[in-house]
């Protein structure tokens, strides 16, 4: 369950390491985000020479969440960390590599580029 002030690990090579969620997109009273949801965040930690700098405001999609997500077959999927991938304006990833596994739910939400770049889809 990702909400305002949640900290996320960045799962791509855009140059950011950690994000702080400012807003969950998808309605004026939406409080929580899950896998495949888009959030607005600020970069709290970044590596030198990266595409993004500390303090930048970015959009990101959640690719891993500690809170379990129920699937249509009745099974649940949960990860060890909360992680996101930073997006460009057209909902394409800003980085060129994705680190770690991503959830299959991203395919249903039309993030095909992220799914194709990921080393493992669970």
Swiss-Prot record:
Source lineage: Bacteria, Bacillati, Actinomycetota, Actinomycetes, Mycobacteriales
Keywords: Ribonucleoprotein, Ribosomal protein, RNA-binding, rRNA-binding
InterPro entries noted in UniProt: Ribosomal_uL14 (IPR000218), Ribosomal_uL14_bac-type (IPR005745), Ribosomal_uL14_CS (IPR019972), Ribosomal_uL14_sf (IPR036853)
Record's GO cellular component terms: cytosolic large ribosomal subunit
Domain of life: Bacteria
Similarity comment: Belongs to the universal ribosomal protein uL14 family.
Subunit structure: Part of the 50S ribosomal subunit. Forms a cluster with proteins L3 and L19. In the 70S ribosome, L14 and L19 interact and together make contacts with the 16S rRNA in bridges B5 and B8.
GO biological process, one term: translation
CDD domains: Ribosomal_uL14
Task of the protein: Binds to 23S rRNA. Forms part of two intersubunit bridges in the 70S ribosome.
Designated name of the protein: Large ribosomal subunit protein uL14
């Amino acid at each position: 369950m990702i909400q305002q002030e949640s900290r996320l690990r960045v799962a791509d090579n855009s140059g950011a390491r950690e994000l702080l969620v400012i807003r969950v997109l998808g309605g004026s009273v939406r409080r929580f985000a899950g896998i495949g949801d888009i959030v607005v965040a600020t970069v709290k930690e970044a590596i030198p020479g990266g595409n993004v700098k500390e303090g930048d405001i970015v959009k990101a999609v959640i690719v891993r969440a500690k809170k379990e997500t129920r699937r249509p077959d009745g099974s649940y999927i949960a990860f060890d960390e909360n992680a996101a991938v930073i997006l460009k304006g057209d909902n394409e990833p800003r980085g060129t590599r994705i680190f770690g596994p991503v959830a299959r739910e991203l395919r249903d939400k039309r993030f095909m580029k992220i799914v194709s770049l990921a080393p493992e889809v669970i």
